[in-house]
Amino acid sequence: RFQGGHNAGHTLVIDGQKTVLHLIPSGILQPDVECFIGNGVVLSLKALREEIEELEAKGLEVRSRVRISPACAIILPWHEMLDRAREEARGDRAIGTTCRGIGPAYEDKVARRGLRTSDLLNPAKLEAKIEHILDFHNFVLTQRFGMKALSVQEMVDQALELGAYFKDQVADVSGRLYELREQGRRVMFE
């Protein structure tokens, strides 16, 4: 997967078995395929964990076969809150967003203020990063939309828990894709 978020999905039917994927590449259904989530993806780790658990409950080996770029922008609760608040504020001019935080996460990526997957693996610096980000987003949430400010500590705890779950899957995706290309292997981007 090279870009996008968990707003869209792929529905696959193989041998009568229906599988719906939002983040995990469809190659996961083939046992010898390595799968990657690249740096262009805005990643809801919560949604990814749910997708992994659903697939593993069906007997698929997923966690050892999916690698995540350390540069992926992470979708966190403030992105979803902003997405929903903006959509509601538009009233009859709503754009039809899924309210899953994808647009606001891309905004943070472009503005160079968002968290990336690698940030979740560095607990010593994580709190300061989240505090800096929430200085900005809590102002918008409270002053523009009249919402309650998010707790830095709650967001740090949530991020650390997700980082611990995914730490073994974060890898140099670009480097591995380069190796595969040099070996003459076929690579499919979706």
Features from the language model and the residues they span:
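Non-transmembrane, aqueous-exposed alpha-helical and coiled segments at domain scale
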Residues: R1-E190
